[in-house]
Amino acid sequence: MRNHKVLLVKRGRPPGEGLWAVPGGRVKLGETLQEAVEREVREETGLIVRARNPVYAFDLIERDEEGRIQYHYVVVDLLADYIKGQPSPDDDALEARWVSFEALRDLPASRTTREVLRKMRDLGPT
């Protein structure tokens, strides 16, 4: 969070293609959650952040029309402190920007993204 706004990206690939979400991705072998967050934010937005503590965790399981599992992710969202940079989309992000909690109402986002952002808002500004 920065100035009562949260960094969001418009996803360019599944899961959540076309939806706004917090930046994220896979944890590489030997990488901590904090290191993964810092790397993914840098890759997707160009921003430098310092990851802090987890605020939300959930399973994301997507199935095809026949009920076969297409994706199963364990998602852990962390708070992060902004260090420097301007949002610029890269990697699998189509857009990247700082968004106020009020403006989020007008953006397409998943239920879980909205829940994560509610928890972040309740924790207060950073």
Residue ranges and their predicted role:
Residues M1-A21, V49, N53, D81-Y82:
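N-terminal strand-loop-strand
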Residues V27, F58, Y82-I83, A93, ...:
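Hydrophobic pocket-lining residues within nucleotide cofactor-binding pockets
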Residues D77, S88-K119:
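NUDIX/MutT-family hydrolases
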Residues V22-V55, L78:
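The catalytic Nudix box helix
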Residues G46-K84:
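Active-site segment of metal-dependent pyrophosphate-handling enzymes
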